[in-house]
Amino acid sequence: MDTIIKGDNKDRCFLCGRTDWIEAHHIFNGTANRKKSEKYGLTVHLCHWCHNEPPNGVHYNQETDTRLKQIGQQAAMNEYGWTVDEFREVFGKNYL
């Protein structure tokens, strides 16, 4: 499924705007949630540095990870008409 995240573009980093070395990032991680991220369109495109390099890459930076999870949760609630409780039923946690 295509992403439902507003402002995401497969050709540039969602966080910094770089246009080289772009990678797909599943907003909600873990085996089950990764598949759910794909199912519900909760992915963004990040450059390699914002995705997977310390200290600011989302896989190393809790603040950035939480920010993307909040954006993802809000997008899912808007797109699918979910309440916070309904989102929590699917992804196991509220990030707002």
Model regions: which residues?
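Short, charged surface segments at domain edges that flank catalytic/cofactor-binding sites
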Residues: 1-12, 35-41
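Short functional micro-motifs and their immediate structural scaffolds
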Residues: 18-23, 52-55
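Short Cys/His-centered divalent metal-binding micro-motifs
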Residues: 43-68
